[in-house]
Amino acid sequence: MNKKLISSISALVVATTLFAGCAKTDNGAAKGGDTKTIKVGLTTDEGGLNDKSFNQSADTGIKKAVDEFKVGYKPIEAKTKDDYESNLDALVADGSDIVFAIGYQMEQAMTAVADKYPDTKFAIIDTVVDKKNVVSYNFKEQEGSFLMGVIAGKMTKTNKIGFIGGKDQVLINRFEVGFAAGVESVNPAAATELKNRGTVVYAESFGDTTLGKEAAKNLMNKGCDVIYHAAGGVGVGMFQAIQEAKNAGKEVWGIGVDMDQAKTLPEYANIILSSMIKRVDTATYEGTKSVVDGNFKGGTSVSLGIKEGAIDIAETSSKNTPKDVLDLVEKYKTAIKDGKITVPSTLEELKSFKPVEVK
């Protein structure tokens, strides 16, 4: 074989090797720079990315995936419900490989968009959209809210406990109901008004801090000294009102939701007993990872609770909540995880709930 032919064959082998080195991996990314980056899109509800709660947690999960898998990411904030479908359309048009809709209010928009774009993968949080290209993530909020109720029931001195919800509907009712069941389990006297909804306020908003402040003031005027919220940005207003009351010499406490709000709102850490951790970030991270790994399962619904590690209490709880109370919370948490306690999730179930004492 002559030298020219040997040289040509060698060059071909090298070129082939280099080309193979740039071949795409299963996740759509390429080794060596010839990359088709997976793109992730997300639209919030009107609470916005910086609600220090639900939407921010969703955003955190995708940012973790960005760091680990080097995916592209584009979030869009909705200002009103009218933005939902157009935001989803825009994310599809931008080339997103998976689009997340954050919140039950987007069910109708997601249903319409999933039909329009059958080849695009979608995920929605807090409701079920039964479409072959949509995975639905739901949480057992009542379980974590029950634990917050145990804390509230043990910490109240007035035996009056309040709840502020974003909107009076099935999802947010799960927070209210679980919370009332937890209070009733450790302090039945403090649960009476809560169960009768005498100390329950729905702001009909997830973003108006003024409404949260007004609601908290009204509850404190009724004698409530512990208030739990499931209202997104409205909860910031609740904390503002409680802080002002604390500054005026009143012993009043707030309980946060979705993220550790003593961390996301450090200026109110001194008046927060605990927060119910709802790992929305786990759902958005796992949803993104499923696309990266090629394991996306559309047409499925995933339910996440204490047993799945997606519901918990804030790690900062020990700052303002005594150890004996937190020890009791852990016992209830174990009982729920082991199936010894089934926490009610509807107002009707709450009526027939029989408290279970753990020791």
At which residue positions do the language-model features occur?
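C-terminal motif of bacterial Sec signal peptides marking the signal peptidase cleavage site
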Residues: T17-G21
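A residue-level marker of the well-folded mature domains of exported/periplasmic proteins
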Residues: A23-K359
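Repetitive helical segments and hydrophobic/amphipathic motifs
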Residues: L12-V13
